[in-house]
Design a protein with these regions (language model features):
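Glycine- and acidic-residue-biased ligand/ion/polar-headgroup-sensing regions
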Residues: 15-28, 32-33
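Short histidine-centered beta-strand/loop micro-motifs
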Residues: 9-14, 31, 37-38, 56-57
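Conserved short histidine dyad/triad with adjacent acidic residue
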Residues: 1-14, 49
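Double-stranded beta-helix
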Residues: 54-90
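Short acidic-glycine-tyrosine-enriched beta hairpin
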Residues: 33-50
Length: 90
């Protein structure tokens, strides 16, 4: 999946967790209550089951990743509210 510059997911969780493999570009990830982290090709990011988070590109660079998650009772993700511009810029 590729995120164009400035694009990001909404806040969300995964019932069995999620692994991101960053393959190109430069991105940002944030766990609820944590700092925004920058990610680069070769980085592997793990989000624990139920951990609220978002991920996307930086403001100026696209980011591509492979996302791996499993389903629990037919559901792989629980989408929540959009990430505000203020949250994204932190």
């Amino acid at each position: 999946m590729t995120f164009e510059p400035g694009a990001r997911t909404a806040w969300h969780t995964h019932p069995l967790g999620q692994t991101l493999l960053i393959t190109a570009g430069c991105g940002r990830v944030q766990r609820e209550g944590g700092a925004v982290e920058e990610v680069h090709p070769g980085d592997v990011v793990w989000f624990s089951a139920g951990e609220r988070h978002w991920h996307g590109a930086t403001a100026t660079t696209a980011m591509t990743h492979i996302a791996i998650q499993e389903q629990l009772d037919g559901k792989a993700v629980n989408w929540e509210e959009h990430v505000s511009d203020a949250q994204y810029r932190r």
